[in-house]
Amino acid sequence: MRRAYFVAIALLVAAGGKTAAGFKHNEPLHASSSNFMASVDTVDEDLQSQNLQESRDPKDDLKLSAGNEERTPSALNNFLKEPKLLESIITAGKAMRTEGEANAIEAASKNLNQIESNKRQRIALTHNAVAGHRGHPSPDSDKSLMSVANENPLMLAESLKDQRPTAIMENAASLLKEHDYRLAPPESSTINDKAPDGRLKNQVVTQKAVQLDKNEHVDESFWREELVSVDQLMRLLDEFDKSAHPTTVNRHEESASAVALKSSNQLESITHQRIAPTSNNVIGQVAHAPSNNVIGQVAHAPSNNVIGQVAHAPSSLSPVLVAKNIPSILADRLMKKRPTAIMKNAARYLTQHINRPAPSGPSTNGATTSNGGLNNQLTSQKTFQLDQNKHVGDVKTFWLPTAVDRQSVPEDWADEVAKGPDTFSNDAVNDEVKRVHAAFLEALNLPFHQYPQETAMMLRMVRWKKNAGPNNDITSALFKTLAKDHEEVLRLQDLLGPDLKKLLGDGKMALPRNLKNLQEALIVKLVIMYDLFFRFCYKHEDFVGDLPHNPSPASWILKL
């Protein structure tokens, strides 16, 4: 606008110079319109009283003097320095008679009036140098503007006693310069909870905080500004401080606690016992004995019943531990240079069998014992993982019922003895043998089938005063002799019927069922079963009775 005004003045000066010579100053001509002189007077008044505002165009040559009063061009007095020049312009204007020149002056006057009516709000003063980003006026005229200092990073570094600004300080200063929605606080204090009109003051935060509150996409890198209240901002920051790594929660899926509750209900009747720690040579698969023995439950049986006479049967047993190097131990006891395929098959089955305990009654889901505790049923290794709260959702694979093919106490002792091997003459199946045999079967879920005459032979061996240990060569030689006495393949197959697949293998990898392999399989089975029977007897020495003092063997296959 001011450029147009000065252009009009320049035109007036040029026109006045041409017409001044032809007209006299004291003889004004009669204009066709009386409004021309009024327009010149208006221009004169505006030149003397108009206060120019700050120019937004940095190319303007006029400099503004800052102060509490309205700003005026400092070079205006120099521009209109000589009164004679102003009088010559007015005189020349009065002498103009053309309608076009009058319209130009009238347009310049209107422009000055428009500048006067559109005065902008003065800019607030700052103590520091203001950055190039000028604050925009707020729609609310009662709220003052906030200016941003150029040296914000340096001031932050000085406040935190750092030598130079860090990257975080630079980012904060950059955000302050780019932010156009900040409201200056009414005082030097921090942000108030309530504004004068009772509404919450809004502070700009990012969508990141809102997503953190919802626990959604906490690691995404995009940002979006959104207005939230101060109270909500404080709550979000408190929640962030409580948990530096919030956990993503899927509300559409079932929680882990609900799954664990279902698992507990499903396993309520088949609760498991925690697996006992083992030594270095133990694979960690154990067998738990039932907390109450079935033999103890038949104390009121008739006196002629053999089982009814075992009122003092062992009530509990320690877990059965399985050694890692079973093939090597078997090779040493049988004087072999290296383990055979049958020894490896037997060791593989022992590690997979886990020797689950016998159930407390006809039902696999036992009730409570006499002391009020639950009957513990050993399940697979998956149950141990459930106890550690691992994979709580895979409930279907966490439990296995007690083996239904477990060997039980024979109802017809004569028939069971007839199916067994031909032992020595001094290994008769008497009442004592039946008592120990029944307790042995009920206390443990045996890996291989045990005949009563085999128990009779082992009971005689364990009572030897010398050379009774499982690692003794004499015991192994006795088992070899028993196996060599059976020279018929069909007879050996009948004896090993329940255990043929365990020892000789199954399918395409099965060993041929010839006499040599069948005899070796019987020897390996007897060696393993005697190792377990020896420790059973010394674990319950009072129940078995008449046992000599023998030190515990150094090497073992199964251990209580």
Curated annotation (Swiss-Prot):
Keyword hit for Membrane: no
Biased composition (Polar residues): 361-377
Keywords: Host nucleus, Secreted, Signal, Virulence
Motif mapping: RxLR-dEER: 56-71
Residue ranges of the region described as Disordered: 48-73, 354-377
Disulphide-bonded residues: none
Signal sequence residues: 1-22
Source organism superkingdom: Eukaryota
Cellular compartments annotated: Secreted; Host nucleus
GO cellular component: extracellular region; host cell nucleus
Compositional bias segments (type: Basic and acidic residues): 54-72
Major location (coarse): secreted
Function: Secreted effector that completely suppresses the host cell death induced by cell death-inducing proteins.
Record text about domains: The RxLR-dEER motif acts to carry the protein into the host cell cytoplasm through binding to cell surface phosphatidylinositol-3-phosphate.
Family: Belongs to the RxLR effector family.
Protein name per its UniProtKB record: Secreted RxLR effector protein 142
